[in-house]
Amino acid sequence: METVNKKELIVSKIKNGTVIDHIPAGRALAVLRILKIAEGYRIALVMNVESKKMGKKDIVKIENKEVDEKEANLITLIAPTATINIIRDYEVVEKKKLKIPDIVKGLLKCTNLMCITNNDVEAIPGFKKISEKPLKMKCVYCDTVIDENEILKQILGSKS
């Protein structure tokens, strides 16, 4: 947890929920959009705090919500350096270091209108990672490449 000095926490600990740490600076609000947080959740956002590894980072704490696998996969695409910590009774019971998978299925859409995934309801879109920095993924059906900007646009603009 980030500290103001060695004894004072910026944000208090949570009893149960999720802490998403090591989010690239400026991406915390995008993470919240992915999680579709409704009224009633207590949330703490810490943005642009110092990080030895990253220079600056964001942190998101959400009480009484555990991030599921689909949400974690979407977060990975916009915050590949993030770590998801599941908290129960003030203790970290699970820690997941996110990593962009080699293949992503069903989370992104191909931008090629002629791709079979845009014309056949049974064809599930799939993308193969071709680079991480910058993030680029290639459609496994038609070889169309989408970049990080397109991925962000799809994830943050999605209504699913």
Swiss-Prot record:
GO terms for cellular component: aspartate carbamoyltransferase complex. Keywords: Metal-binding, Pyrimidine biosynthesis, Zinc. One of its GO terms (molecular function) is metal ion binding. GO terms for biological process: 'de novo' pyrimidine nucleobase biosynthetic process; pyrimidine nucleotide biosynthetic process. Binds 1 zinc ion per subunit. InterPro entries: Asp_carbamoyltransf_reg_N (IPR020545), Asp_carbamoylTrfase_reg (IPR002801), Asp_carbamoyltrfase_reg_C (IPR020542), Asp_carbatrfase_reg_C_sf (IPR036792), Asp_carbatrfase_reg_N_sf (IPR036793). Pfam families: PyrI (PF01948), PyrI_C (PF02748). Zn(2+) binds at C110, C115, C139, C142. The keyword Metal-binding applies. Its cofactor is Zn(2+). Contains catalytic and regulatory chains. Belongs to the PyrI family. Involved in allosteric regulation of aspartate carbamoyltransferase. PANTHER family: ASPARTATE CARBAMOYLTRANSFERASE REGULATORY CHAIN. This is Aspartate carbamoyltransferase regulatory chain.
